[in-house]
UniProtKB/Swiss-Prot annotation:
Natural source organism: Trichlorobacter lovleyi (strain ATCC BAA-1151 / DSM 17278 / SZ) (Geobacter lovleyi)
Protein name according to UniProt: tRNA-specific 2-thiouridylase MnmA
Family per record: Belongs to the MnmA/TRMU family.
Its job: Catalyzes the 2-thiolation of uridine at the wobble position (U34) of tRNA, leading to the formation of s(2)U34.
EC number(s) stated in the UniProt entry for this protein: 2.8.1.13
Chain segments annotated as coiled-coil in the UniProt record: none
Catalysed reaction, written as an equation: S-sulfanyl-L-cysteinyl-[protein] + uridine(34) in tRNA + AH2 + ATP = 2-thiouridine(34) in tRNA + L-cysteinyl-[protein] + A + AMP + diphosphate + H(+)
Amino acids binding ATP: A7, M8, S9, G10, G11, V12, D13, S14, M33, G118
Cross-referenced Pfam families: tRNA_Me_trans, tRNA_Me_trans_C, tRNA_Me_trans_M
Enzyme category, top tier: transferase
Any single GO CC term annotated in Swiss-Prot or TrEMBL for this entry: cytoplasm
SUPFAM superfamilies: Adenine nucleotide alpha hydrolases-like
Amino acid sequence: MSRIAVAMSGGVDSSVVAALLQQQGHEVIGITMQLFEPCSSGPGTPAHDGAQVAAQLGIPHHLLRLEPQFRDLIIDNFIDQYRQGQTPNPCILCNRLIKFGLLLEQARELGAELLATGHYVRRTVGPDGLCHLRTAANQAKDQSYFLYSLSQQQLRQVIFPLGEIASKDEVRSLATGFGLAVATKGDSQEVCFIPNDDYAAFLEQQGIKASPGNIVHIGGQVLGRHSGTHRYTIGQRKGLGIGWSEPLYVLEIDSSRNLIVVGEQQHLLKAGLIGADISWIIPPPATSFNTTCKIRYRHQPVPCRVELLADDQCRVLFDEAQRSVTPGQFVVFYQDDQVLGGGRIQAACTAEQP
């Protein structure tokens, strides 16, 4: 049996992971990360609930204080991208640098052979000795999109015990069976450091000024005024405050000129994208190849052609044009249920662009 550290967020998923591994006879250590100063230290917080579950299971529990690192690596990056008119996904960066970076280092320092998390994803090892990341049995909860940037070195040191569990109801049933205090606790919010998922309020609290500017039609006409580019996202329709013969959508966020560009629905469709900072879990099969990709978490994989470019970039051409390709989000490539790799969406491409 192994000495395994479990990333315990105080939620149902990671608590069940700890209980399952203990049931299997492993020596389990609980680690809870404190990433930002909580509003309280009582019930419902990761530190409290993680420690409570660890005490129930009779396992050691460690609180890892990472507030300065999380601020520097994740929150400041998030704010900077919004300043540039992009729509970031901080969870992907957090997984690579924090959970499977600093937390994994702490697990090794505590003598753990492996780090286990409550992610819904599967990791297998192929005949070639390479680790493969695959979608979870529970497709509705699959989190493989968020882990595309993990390296082989990271994947060799982690396990995902919930990857084969078919439903969240089954996880909750296990939590109840283990008598865990968090068995009925709700799922966590989308971005952990943004209170009430109010992005605009958070960004303004962090120093981004709500600078009004023009809302411009793709044809060039000034149609109205916006209340700050950080308050808008690609594909947004509601809240524009514009009367027009057809529904209008946000097509572009130009923070350098303080403009929001809008247009009719057909202008949201893009033929492809340019990806940057591309990384691969397994080597790409060729410099140009067909596969499928997701351009946001809840997007269904769509057929595409990938062309590798210099400087860890790539061009992606969709078989059918896709709606709301958003700079700052991520494109992740799949071959059937296997994650190949991915990268940050740098720009959307129309059919006329090279």
